[in-house]
From Swiss-Prot:
Mn(2+) 1 binds at D400, H404, H460. It comes from the Bacteria. It comes from Idiomarina loihiensis (strain ATCC BAA-735 / DSM 15497 / L2-TR). This is 2,3-bisphosphoglycerate-independent phosphoglycerate mutase. Monomer. Keywords: Glycolysis, Isomerase, Manganese, Metal-binding. Pfam families: iPGM_N, Metalloenzyme.
Length: 511
């Protein structure tokens, strides 16, 4: 009979990949006595969080949304990126009812088509191939005025990598004989997810009203001028390109990001009737606003690729069996341990509690690499000591959020802060007879420089991630993120649902 283990805690160390020691490996260079001891002492293995193992195209780096969906689902979940790319390749994208209807409405109203999204080959929040397809579709269906509002990456891509993408789209516009860049914004402004409305406001006013203190004759000059100001792609101040092209009556707007978390705030500014984040100014009577995917079920706008339901994810299965669960993280990864881990569900399951620890209000997290880890750990330790929960899901964002800054020394400090927190959590669990699983959703901090470009490496990696079981004697096997939920169920003595096709990474010696 399986002994009662309460709680079982899953610690997700965001961006903590496994890589042999290298000069730019912030994790290896950090002083991490706790993780080093746990790796040596307890059953451990490596799991795959990228490419086909998580439902992405082969070779595509993993990301936090994809990672948490797979962690919670217990099966490989084919991602929106893959789904949309397939629709483009089989041409079903070009007959998508939602997209076609919005284009027809704009044409009937003699309105323009505005396409906005992250101009990136990173494949984390968007892919520029999808923007190309949307522009081609708009022109094919008779749109006369097509405007591209491009958000620049430099986070999931090298910090200064926008110019080749801009050249690609300028060539596309020339080939089609229609379309142009209307605005550029660094994703720092256009894709905030922490209610820093002053950032969204700057990008929104450029896109919606054609207003900015920075203008440029063309997109290439805009980027080169930004570089001269010391701005990398992510931080490019919103720029109006050429003659302003504000949103006007009858226009249709298409938001081409497929990942929800960093698309919600800009979408709220466009569509929420009671929006109060900032003064939006005058509002046009637009024909349609289309989300590529559903960014939130509370947003009143159609989505071209609505969610495909996931049944019997870990949270739902625990609730069906009267188990209690806690989801806890900082602001930056709160959506990941709740919405994404629950397969796209906004509301709590029966017996689920959620705790949000505010992330520090700093421009970039290399300025405070420990982030809010101490406060997060205080809350987590208190929850463990209460013994009120059967399962706890916690994310420490530091490795990823600081890794994205490209600041090596800060990433080292981030890893050390997380290591200290893990030590506190494990000690609290030992005191109450609980157990712990430690893993990551994808890599990041283990590679901080790009050998090809010589620039800082700010993106995720394709590296495997560690998996440690701090508990009973067991044998470990390598696997993928979708094996984690079945592992949790196995360790607490529950059968897994038929929908979960993953298998436990641990075999208890008593089994």
């Amino acid at each position: 009979m399986t002994p009662t283990i309460k709680p079982l805690v899953l610690l997700i160390l965001d961006g903590w990949g496994y890589r042999e020691d290298a000069p730019d490996n912030a994790i290896a260079k950090a002083n991490t006595p706790v993780m080093d001891r746990l790796w040596e002492k307890y059953p451990h293995c490596l799991v795959d969080g990228s490419g086909g193992a998580v439902g992405l195209p082969d070779g595509q780096m993993g990301n936090s949304e994809v990672g948490h969906v797979n962690l919670g689902a217990g099966r490989i979940v084919y991602q929106d990126f893959t789904r949309i790319s397939k629709a483009i390749s089989d041409r079903s994208f070009f007959s998508n009812t939602i997209l076609c209807d919005a284009l027809k409405k704009a044409k009937a109203a003699k309105g323009a088509v505005h396409i906005m999204g992250l101009l990136s080959a990173g494949g984390v929040h968007s892919h520029e191939d999808h923007l190309v397809a949307m522009i081609e579709m708009a022109v094919e269906q008779g749109a006369e005025d097509v405007y591209l509002h491009a958000f620049l990456d430099g986070r999931d891509t090298p910090p200064k990598s926008a110019l080749p993408s801009i050249e690609r789209f300028e060539a596309l516009f020339a080939r089609l004989g229609k379309g142009r860049f209307a605005t550029l914004s660094g994703r720092f402004f256009a894709m905030d997810r922490d209610k820093r409305w002053e950032r969204i406001e700057q990008s929104y006013k450029a896109v919606y009203h054609g207003l900015s203190g920075v203008t440029s004759a063309n997109a290439t000059d805009a980027v080169e001028n930004a570089y001269e100001r010391g701005e990398t792609d992510e931080f490019v101040t919103p720029v109006v390109i050429g003659q302003p092209a504000p949103i006007a009556n009858g226009d249709s707007v298409f938001f081409m990001n497929f990942r929800a978390d960093r698309a919600r705030e800009m979408t709220q500014a466009f569509v929420d009737k009671d929006f109060d984040g900032f003064d939006r100014g005058s509002r046009a009577d637009i024909s349609e606003f289309v989300m590529l995917t559903q960014y939130a079920d509370t947003l009143e706008a159609p989505s071209a690729f609505p969610p495909e339901p996931l049944n019997n994810v870990l949270g739902e299965w625990l609730a069906k069996h009267d188990k209690t669960q806690l989801r806890i993280s900082e602001t930056e990864k709160y959506a990941h341990v709740t919405f994404f881990f629950s397969g796209g569900r906004e509301q709590e399951f029966e017996g689920e509690k959620r705790v949000l620890i505010p992330s520090p209000k700093v421009k970039t997290y290399d300025l405070q690499p420990e982030m809010s880890s101490e406060q997060l750990t205080d809350e987590l330790v208190a929850a463990i000591e209460s013994q009120a929960f059967d399962v706890v899901i916690c994310n420490y964002p530091n490795g990823d959020m600081v890794g994205h800054t490209g600041n090596f020394d800060a990433a080292v400090k981030a890893c050390e802060a997380v290591d200290h927190s893990v030590g506190r959590v494990v000690s609290a669990l030992e005191a109450v007879g609980g157990e712990c699983l430690i893993t990551a959703d994808h890599g990041n901090a283990e590679q901080m420089s790009d050998a090809t470009t010589g620039q800082a490496h700010t993106a995720h990696t394709n590296e495997l991630v560690p998996f440690i079981y701090v508990g009973r004697p067991a044998k470990a096997r390598n696997g993928r993120l979708s094996d984690v939920a079945p592992t949790i169920l196995h360790l607490i003595g529950m059968e897994q649902p038929d929908e979960m096709t993953g298998t436990s990474l641990m075999t208890l010696e008593q089994d």
